[in-house]
Regions:
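Hydrophobic core positions of alpha-helical segments in small-molecule transporters
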Residues: 39, 101-102, 129-132
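Glycine-/small-residue-enriched transmembrane alpha-helix faces in small-molecule transporters
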Residues: 1-34, 81, 85, 139
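Hydrophobic transmembrane alpha-helices of multi-pass small-molecule transport proteins
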Residues: 127-145
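Transmembrane alpha-helical segments of integral membrane proteins
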Residues: 108-118
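Structural motif at transmembrane-helix junctions in multi-pass transporters
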Residues: 28-32, 85-104, 118
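Hydrophobic/aromatic residues within the transmembrane alpha-helices of Major Facilitator Superfamily
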Residues: 14, 18, 46, 77, ...
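Membrane-interface interhelical linkers
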Residues: 1-11, 25-28, 45-73, 93, ...
């Protein structure tokens, strides 16, 4: 079953590369990465509304919303920054280098989240194997950009 989840994650990664490239192109047409990010996020909102109207999930209780820790609510602002970064940086770095750098940043942050168990992530220590894998990814970032 893990393989299904991995394939879905790879598909999501492909979507990230497509999104960054589309937003970078839109930035060129609109001459401003902020507008490219704005219109991309508007598309996200419309898509989310259509999905919610179609699937009609039960709403969470007010108590569940109120009791959520503050860091549960940073996904939206962080998503906006990611979209803006894609629109601004993909035309400068190229799609592969931008995504490679994003993956490097994601991996570094993920290792910290895992090691310390932040944000309810299951705690997994930083092992030599995990550190070596991360270093190989960072080497890949350099290779993708410069070779």
């Amino acid at each position: 079953m893990d393989m299904v989840w991995i394939v879905l994650a790879v598909g999501a990664g492909a979507c990230l590369a497509l999104q960054a490239s589309a937003n970078g192109s839109l930035r060129g047409n609109l001459a401003d990465p902020r507008y490219a990010a704005f219109f991309s996020i508007c598309g996200t909102i419309v898509t989310a509304i259509v999905v919610m109207l179609f699937l009609r999930p039960s709403p969470p209780s007010l108590n569940a919303i109120r009791s959520a820790p503050w860091w549960n609510w940073i996904g939206g602002p962080l998503g906006a920054l990611i979209v803006l970064a894609g629109a601004a940086l993909t035309p400068k770095l190229g799609a592969a280098a931008f995504i490679a750098a994003m993956v490097g940043g994601q991996l570094f942050c993920s290792l910290l989240l895992d090691h310390f168990g932040f944000m309810n992530v299951p705690q997994q220590g930083l092992t030599l194997g995990r550190l070596t894998g991360a270093m190989m990814v960072f080497a890949g970032v350099v290779l993708v950009k410069y070779w």
